[in-house]
Curated annotation (Swiss-Prot):
This is UPF0494 membrane protein SPAC212.01c. Disulfide bonds: none annotated. The keyword Transmembrane applies. It is found in: Membrane. The chain crosses the membrane at residues 107-127, 144-164, 178-198, 199-219. GO terms for cellular component: external side of plasma membrane. It is a multi-pass membrane protein. The keyword Cell division does not apply. Belongs to the UPF0494 family. InterPro entries: DUF999.
Length: 280
Protein backbone atom coordinates (compact mmCIF):
# COMPACT_ATOMS: atom_id res chain seq x y z
CA UNK A 1 0.00 0.00 0.00
CA UNK A 2 1.10 3.48 -0.62
CA UNK A 3 1.88 5.88 2.09
CA UNK A 4 -0.90 8.53 2.62
CA UNK A 5 1.72 11.29 2.86
CA UNK A 6 3.06 10.37 -0.56
CA UNK A 7 -0.46 10.45 -1.95
CA UNK A 8 -0.99 13.83 -0.39
CA UNK A 9 2.20 15.10 -2.00
CA UNK A 10 1.11 13.76 -5.37
CA UNK A 11 -2.37 15.26 -5.08
CA UNK A 12 -1.19 18.72 -4.03
CA UNK A 13 0.23 21.00 -6.70
CA UNK A 14 3.98 21.27 -6.84
CA UNK A 15 3.80 24.90 -5.81
CA UNK A 16 2.39 23.99 -2.41
CA UNK A 17 4.67 21.09 -1.50
CA UNK A 18 7.16 21.25 1.26
CA UNK A 19 10.16 21.66 -1.00
CA UNK A 20 8.86 24.60 -3.06
CA UNK A 21 6.68 26.47 -0.60
CA UNK A 22 6.27 30.11 -1.68
CA UNK A 23 3.90 32.85 -0.73
CA UNK A 24 3.05 34.32 -4.13
CA UNK A 25 1.17 31.82 -6.24
CA UNK A 26 1.10 34.09 -9.29
CA UNK A 27 4.89 33.93 -9.61
CA UNK A 28 5.09 30.13 -9.34
CA UNK A 29 5.39 27.65 -12.16
CA UNK A 30 2.84 25.03 -11.10
CA UNK A 31 4.31 22.35 -13.36
CA UNK A 32 7.85 22.52 -11.99
CA UNK A 33 7.24 24.24 -8.65
CA UNK A 34 9.79 26.99 -9.37
CA UNK A 35 9.63 30.72 -8.93
CA UNK A 36 8.94 32.50 -12.17
CA UNK A 37 10.53 35.79 -11.11
CA UNK A 38 13.34 35.95 -8.63
CA UNK A 39 14.02 39.28 -6.90
CA UNK A 40 16.99 40.01 -9.15
CA UNK A 41 14.93 39.39 -12.27
CA UNK A 42 12.07 41.44 -10.89
CA UNK A 43 14.40 44.37 -10.16
CA UNK A 44 15.94 44.16 -13.62
CA UNK A 45 12.56 44.00 -15.29
CA UNK A 46 11.24 46.90 -13.21
CA UNK A 47 14.31 48.95 -14.11
CA UNK A 48 13.87 48.13 -17.77
CA UNK A 49 10.19 49.01 -17.69
CA UNK A 50 10.97 52.27 -15.88
CA UNK A 51 13.67 53.13 -18.40
CA UNK A 52 11.34 52.33 -21.27
CA UNK A 53 8.65 54.57 -19.79
CA UNK A 54 11.16 57.36 -19.26
CA UNK A 55 12.44 57.00 -22.79
CA UNK A 56 8.91 57.12 -24.12
CA UNK A 57 8.21 60.20 -22.03
CA UNK A 58 11.37 61.96 -23.16
CA UNK A 59 10.80 60.98 -26.77
CA UNK A 60 7.28 62.35 -26.70
CA UNK A 61 8.11 65.54 -24.80
CA UNK A 62 11.58 66.60 -26.00
CA UNK A 63 11.80 66.01 -29.74
CA UNK A 64 11.40 69.68 -30.55
CA UNK A 65 14.16 70.69 -28.14
CA UNK A 66 16.49 68.10 -29.65
CA UNK A 67 15.73 69.40 -33.13
CA UNK A 68 16.34 72.96 -31.99
CA UNK A 69 19.65 71.97 -30.41
CA UNK A 70 20.69 70.20 -33.60
CA UNK A 71 19.80 73.27 -35.67
CA UNK A 72 21.62 75.66 -33.36
CA UNK A 73 24.70 73.42 -33.33
CA UNK A 74 24.69 73.31 -37.11
CA UNK A 75 24.38 77.08 -37.29
CA UNK A 76 27.25 77.52 -34.82
CA UNK A 77 29.45 75.10 -36.77
CA UNK A 78 28.63 76.89 -40.02
CA UNK A 79 29.48 80.29 -38.54
CA UNK A 80 32.72 78.98 -37.06
CA UNK A 81 33.74 77.43 -40.38
CA UNK A 82 32.86 80.63 -42.20
CA UNK A 83 34.90 82.70 -39.76
CA UNK A 84 37.91 80.42 -40.02
CA UNK A 85 37.78 80.39 -43.82
CA UNK A 86 37.42 84.15 -43.94
CA UNK A 87 40.32 84.52 -41.52
CA UNK A 88 42.44 82.18 -43.62
CA UNK A 89 41.54 84.15 -46.74
CA UNK A 90 42.71 87.54 -45.57
CA UNK A 91 44.80 86.28 -42.61
CA UNK A 92 44.00 89.13 -40.26
CA UNK A 93 44.24 87.62 -36.81
CA UNK A 94 44.87 90.09 -34.02
CA UNK A 95 46.78 88.32 -31.22
CA UNK A 96 47.85 90.80 -28.55
CA UNK A 97 47.01 93.74 -30.78
CA UNK A 98 49.38 92.70 -33.60
CA UNK A 99 48.53 92.22 -37.27
CA UNK A 100 50.03 89.31 -39.13
CA UNK A 101 51.49 89.98 -42.59
CA UNK A 102 51.60 86.47 -44.00
CA UNK A 103 48.94 86.96 -46.63
CA UNK A 104 49.71 85.95 -50.22
CA UNK A 105 47.98 89.07 -51.52
CA UNK A 106 50.14 91.42 -49.51
CA UNK A 107 52.86 92.16 -52.04
CA UNK A 108 50.57 92.59 -55.07
CA UNK A 109 48.37 94.91 -53.06
CA UNK A 110 51.36 96.90 -51.86
CA UNK A 111 52.67 97.25 -55.41
CA UNK A 112 49.27 98.35 -56.71
CA UNK A 113 48.90 100.87 -53.90
CA UNK A 114 52.42 102.17 -54.55
CA UNK A 115 51.75 102.66 -58.27
CA UNK A 116 48.52 104.51 -57.54
CA UNK A 117 50.23 106.73 -54.98
CA UNK A 118 53.15 107.44 -57.35
CA UNK A 119 50.85 108.57 -60.16
CA UNK A 120 48.76 110.63 -57.77
CA UNK A 121 51.83 112.37 -56.35
CA UNK A 122 53.28 112.93 -59.83
CA UNK A 123 50.01 114.42 -61.09
CA UNK A 124 49.68 116.69 -58.10
CA UNK A 125 53.26 117.92 -57.67
CA UNK A 126 54.78 117.10 -61.13
CA UNK A 127 57.71 115.26 -59.60
CA UNK A 128 58.83 113.66 -62.86
CA UNK A 129 58.92 117.00 -64.67
CA UNK A 130 60.84 118.66 -61.85
CA UNK A 131 63.39 115.85 -61.64
CA UNK A 132 63.73 115.74 -65.44
CA UNK A 133 64.54 119.44 -65.51
CA UNK A 134 67.04 118.99 -62.70
CA UNK A 135 68.71 116.05 -64.47
CA UNK A 136 68.77 117.94 -67.79
CA UNK A 137 70.49 120.83 -66.17
CA UNK A 138 73.10 118.46 -64.74
CA UNK A 139 73.45 116.63 -68.11
CA UNK A 140 72.09 113.33 -66.94
CA UNK A 141 68.98 113.49 -69.04
CA UNK A 142 67.58 110.67 -71.15
CA UNK A 143 64.15 110.68 -72.77
CA UNK A 144 63.35 107.05 -71.83
CA UNK A 145 65.40 105.84 -68.91
CA UNK A 146 65.30 108.83 -66.65
CA UNK A 147 61.47 108.93 -66.23
CA UNK A 148 61.45 105.17 -65.77
CA UNK A 149 64.15 105.43 -63.12
CA UNK A 150 62.25 108.24 -61.43
CA UNK A 151 59.05 106.20 -61.29
CA UNK A 152 60.92 103.13 -60.09
CA UNK A 153 62.56 105.12 -57.33
CA UNK A 154 59.23 106.59 -56.32
CA UNK A 155 57.69 103.13 -56.38
CA UNK A 156 60.45 101.72 -54.18
CA UNK A 157 60.07 104.62 -51.78
CA UNK A 158 56.32 104.07 -51.59
CA UNK A 159 56.80 100.36 -51.00
CA UNK A 160 59.32 100.98 -48.24
CA UNK A 161 57.08 103.57 -46.65
CA UNK A 162 54.08 101.26 -46.80
CA UNK A 163 56.08 98.35 -45.38
CA UNK A 164 57.94 100.11 -42.60
CA UNK A 165 55.30 102.64 -41.68
CA UNK A 166 52.44 100.15 -41.60
CA UNK A 167 53.15 99.39 -37.95
CA UNK A 168 53.13 103.09 -37.11
CA UNK A 169 49.88 103.52 -39.02
CA UNK A 170 48.27 100.64 -37.16
CA UNK A 171 49.58 102.00 -33.87
CA UNK A 172 48.22 105.43 -34.75
CA UNK A 173 44.84 103.92 -35.56
CA UNK A 174 44.82 102.04 -32.26
CA UNK A 175 45.81 105.15 -30.31
CA UNK A 176 43.17 107.16 -32.16
CA UNK A 177 40.53 104.58 -31.29
CA UNK A 178 41.58 104.60 -27.64
CA UNK A 179 41.53 108.41 -27.57
CA UNK A 180 38.06 108.48 -29.14
CA UNK A 181 36.82 105.89 -26.66
CA UNK A 182 38.29 107.82 -23.70
CA UNK A 183 36.85 111.10 -24.97
CA UNK A 184 33.46 109.46 -25.44
CA UNK A 185 33.57 108.05 -21.92
CA UNK A 186 34.63 111.41 -20.47
CA UNK A 187 31.92 113.24 -22.40
CA UNK A 188 29.38 110.66 -21.27
CA UNK A 189 30.46 111.13 -17.66
CA UNK A 190 30.31 114.91 -18.01
CA UNK A 191 26.83 114.71 -19.52
CA UNK A 192 25.73 112.35 -16.76
CA UNK A 193 27.15 114.68 -14.09
CA UNK A 194 25.47 117.67 -15.73
CA UNK A 195 22.21 115.74 -15.85
CA UNK A 196 22.55 114.89 -12.17
CA UNK A 197 23.34 118.52 -11.36
CA UNK A 198 20.35 119.72 -13.39
CA UNK A 199 18.14 117.14 -11.70
CA UNK A 200 19.44 118.20 -8.28
CA UNK A 201 18.87 121.86 -9.15
CA UNK A 202 15.38 121.01 -10.33
CA UNK A 203 14.65 119.19 -7.08
CA UNK A 204 16.06 122.11 -5.07
CA UNK A 205 13.99 124.61 -7.05
CA UNK A 206 10.88 122.47 -6.61
CA UNK A 207 11.53 122.18 -2.87
CA UNK A 208 12.10 125.93 -2.60
CA UNK A 209 8.91 126.60 -4.54
CA UNK A 210 6.92 124.28 -2.30
CA UNK A 211 8.46 125.88 0.81
CA UNK A 212 7.74 129.40 -0.41
CA UNK A 213 4.18 128.43 -1.31
CA UNK A 214 3.66 126.91 2.13
CA UNK A 215 5.09 129.97 3.86
CA UNK A 216 2.90 132.31 1.83
CA UNK A 217 -0.17 130.24 2.55
CA UNK A 218 0.62 130.07 6.27
CA UNK A 219 1.29 133.83 6.39
CA UNK A 220 -1.96 134.58 4.60
CA UNK A 221 -3.88 132.30 6.96
CA UNK A 222 -2.24 133.83 10.07
CA UNK A 223 -2.90 137.38 8.85
CA UNK A 224 -6.51 136.54 8.09
CA UNK A 225 -7.00 135.05 11.55
CA UNK A 226 -5.36 138.04 13.26
CA UNK A 227 -7.50 140.53 11.36
CA UNK A 228 -10.71 138.63 12.12
CA UNK A 229 -9.87 138.28 15.81
CA UNK A 230 -8.71 141.88 16.20
CA UNK A 231 -11.86 143.28 14.63
CA UNK A 232 -14.08 141.04 16.76
CA UNK A 233 -15.75 139.33 13.85
CA UNK A 234 -17.34 135.94 14.25
CA UNK A 235 -16.94 133.50 11.42
CA UNK A 236 -20.21 131.74 10.63
CA UNK A 237 -19.94 128.43 8.86
CA UNK A 238 -22.80 127.00 6.81
CA UNK A 239 -23.47 124.47 9.59
CA UNK A 240 -23.95 127.19 12.16
CA UNK A 241 -26.66 128.96 10.16
CA UNK A 242 -30.13 127.97 11.44
CA UNK A 243 -33.51 128.78 10.00
CA UNK A 244 -35.55 131.10 12.18
CA UNK A 245 -39.31 131.51 12.20
CA UNK A 246 -40.72 132.80 9.00
CA UNK A 247 -41.55 136.43 9.42
CA UNK A 248 -43.85 138.21 7.04
CA UNK A 249 -42.38 141.25 5.38
CA UNK A 250 -44.15 144.24 4.06
CA UNK A 251 -44.25 142.54 0.69
CA UNK A 252 -45.84 139.45 2.16
CA UNK A 253 -42.67 137.41 1.60
CA UNK A 254 -40.84 135.28 4.13
CA UNK A 255 -37.33 136.01 5.30
CA UNK A 256 -34.71 133.67 6.79
CA UNK A 257 -32.73 135.04 9.72
CA UNK A 258 -29.83 133.54 11.55
CA UNK A 259 -29.27 133.61 15.28
CA UNK A 260 -26.76 136.40 14.94
CA UNK A 261 -29.22 138.67 13.11
CA UNK A 262 -32.34 138.02 15.27
CA UNK A 263 -31.24 140.25 18.16
CA UNK A 264 -30.15 143.06 15.90
CA UNK A 265 -33.32 143.14 13.78
CA UNK A 266 -35.91 143.52 16.57
CA UNK A 267 -36.62 147.09 15.65
CA UNK A 268 -37.12 146.20 12.02
CA UNK A 269 -39.51 143.42 12.98
CA UNK A 270 -41.57 145.77 15.16
CA UNK A 271 -41.76 148.27 12.38
CA UNK A 272 -42.94 145.58 10.01
CA UNK A 273 -45.68 144.44 12.44
CA UNK A 274 -47.08 147.95 12.85
CA UNK A 275 -50.21 148.59 10.80
CA UNK A 276 -49.68 150.67 7.75
CA UNK A 277 -51.85 153.77 7.37
CA UNK A 278 -54.72 153.37 4.98
CA UNK A 279 -54.99 155.92 2.28
CA UNK A 280 -58.31 157.67 1.98
Amino acid sequence: MSNPESLKKQVEPPGYNELFMVEDVCNVDLEQGLDLCKPEKVNKQSQRSRQSRQSLFTNTIKPQKDKMNIKTNKIKEFLNDLFTEFSKFHNSYYPDGRISTRSNFRWPLLIIWSIIIVFAVDKKFEVQKFLSIWINENRFYSEIWVPIAIYVCLLVLMLLSLIFFAEFAVLALRVTGVIIAVLGAVLGMIIAVLGMIIAALGMIIAALGATITGLLYFGHWALYKLVILSLGFKIVTPGDVCVSNTLPTHNGETALHSETTVGSDIEQIELQNMPTPVKK
